[in-house]
Amino acid sequence: LLEAFMSTHSLIPSTGLGLPIARMRAVFQPAEVERKLHSLQAQGSDKEHAALCQTYQRMLERGPERFAVKPSGVPDMASLYDQLPNFTEPLDDVKRHVALSHASADSLELTPMLLLGPPGVGKTHFARLLADMLGTQTSLVPMSAMTAGWLLSGSSSQWKGAKPGKVFQALVDGEYANPVIVVDEIDKAATDAQYDPLGALYSLLEHDTAQSFVDEFAEVAVDASQVIWITTANDERQIPKPILNRMNVFQIEPPDADASRRIAAQLYRSIRNEHDWGRWFVDDLSPDVLDLLAPLPPREMRRALMTGFGNARLEGRDHLTPDDLPRNGPAKTRMGFVQ
């Protein structure tokens, strides 16, 4: 496991942190899983609950140990501040928590945060960059697309097609005891008279109760106390007060023109470095291309840049020009019958 960790993280871009420090932490108790499995087998219910038995067997085969990572020192984070100029306050909060865990046996414990702001200001982008900096993985839970209330906490194994929730999957099927879980657009969670889609968060956002979180499918306790929670929303009025009170709330404003240019420049370099084909292109964007990208939200910037890279490649150029970028927002392809 440690060799796999070192192999994975030797390629993480430098942010002034060095390699993360990894400790092993048990995310469940094997004895409890064994009892549940033996109980099903003794009752002759192993065929009826085949998916549940397979889950227990998979847990026992992998074992309970997962990486719990934290930066090896107090971070410089200059690169992140440059890439996320409108996220100064949440980055400051992260830096404080990292400083507390530095040079101690304590694990990194971040207070759950709510990033409040209009669509397209880079809230989910922030979460991914934070996970990269900390050396852990990201799991996205899109509440606006939720079709059932059990997405976070799983559904009872009594139901047909039941399966574990996102928290269980991130911890048991993932590599880390402290993944970043992003609950996206928490204010758009559908309300249901039979099931509160946010109900699981009441215990998950509290460190003490999260230590023994029980997924409704697996019905065994998992330790979710190390999860790094980031929620995003456009309207805090739609979020229950008890959940708001469990989080640090940060208002994220759209970046100004100068900050938007820096974001576009960083995003260009990031995309270029992420792909093998990036070696075909020059290191930086020209000022006229930056001028066109700056008014766009980060999400649209990325789409525009990908279009630009493709058009430049088709023309055999190693740089993007204004003509490579899409005009008048995202293009829509018309389909229909030819008359």
Predicted regions and their residues:
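AAA+/SF3 P-loop NTPase mechanochemical coupling elements
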Residues: 175-178, 213-232
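AAA+/P-loop NTPase substrate/partner-engagement loops
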Residues: 133-163, 170, 260
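Interdomain "pre-motor" coupling segment immediately N-terminal to P-loop NTPase/helicase cores
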Residues: 24-74
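Pre-Walker A (pre-P-loop) alpha-helix and adjacent loop at the N terminus of AAA/AAA+ ATPase modules
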Residues: 71-116
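Conserved catalytic/switch belt of AAA+ P-loop NTPases
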Residues: 183-222
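C-terminal engagement/docking regions of AAA+ P-loop ATPases
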Residues: 315-339
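Conserved C-terminal "switch" segment of AAA+ ATPases
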Residues: 66, 175, 236-242, 253-319
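Walker A/P-loop
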Residues: 109-143, 172
